[in-house]
Amino acid sequence: MIFETLDEFAGAVPPMRGLIGLDLGTKTIGVALSDRLLTSASALETVKRKKFGVDADALAGLIAKHEVGGIILGLPRNMDGSEGPRAQATRAFALNLSRRGDFAHLALGFWDERLSTVAAERALIAADTSRKRRSEVIDAVAASYILQGALDRLRHLRAV
C-alpha cells in the first residue's frame, strides 16, 4: 500500500523489519537497507535497470532475502517543491510495485530526495573514493542518504 506521509507509513511497517530505500534513475536503481531497529541505513547495491518486470523481480529477491517490511522511494522534487516528470515516473513505479502480488504486503512511502546525490558525491569525494568507484556506488549511497532521512523522521515521530 502506498502512503503519502511518513506518519501513515510508520503505522504500517511491521515491528522488527527493516526498510529498503530506492533511488530511481533512468539507468540504475540505487538500493539501501536499514537495520531492523530502523536507526541506520547502509548502501546495499545498484541494480541495472532493464524492464519493469525484471527490475521488480530483482527488488523482490532483495526484499525476501533481507526480510524487509517497507520501501522508501526517493521522490525527486524540483527545488521549488513542485513535482516534475521524474517525480511522476517515481510515483508510477511505486504504483506498479504495489499492484504486484509479491509487494502487496509492503508499505511504500516517499521521501524528498533533493540534493541526495550531491551529498553522496561529496561524501565519496571526502572519503577519497576514485572516480571509477564513485560511479559504481553513487546511486546506492544516494539511496542510503534518502533512507537515512526517512529513518530520522520516523525516529522523531516515535519520540513525539
From Swiss-Prot:
Its EC number is 3.1.-.-. CDD domains: YqgF. GO terms for cellular component: cytosol. Transmembrane segments: none annotated. InterPro entries: RNaseH-like_sf, YqgF, YqgF/RNaseH-like_dom, YqgF/RNaseH-like_dom_sf. GO terms for biological process: rRNA 5'-end processing. Its main location: cytoplasm. Disulfide bonds: none annotated. Keywords: Cytoplasm, Hydrolase, Nuclease, Ribosome biogenesis. It is found in: Cytoplasm. GO terms for molecular function: nuclease activity. Belongs to the YqgF nuclease family. Could be a nuclease involved in processing of the 5'-end of pre-16S rRNA. This is Putative pre-16S rRNA nuclease. It comes from Jannaschia sp. (strain CCS1).
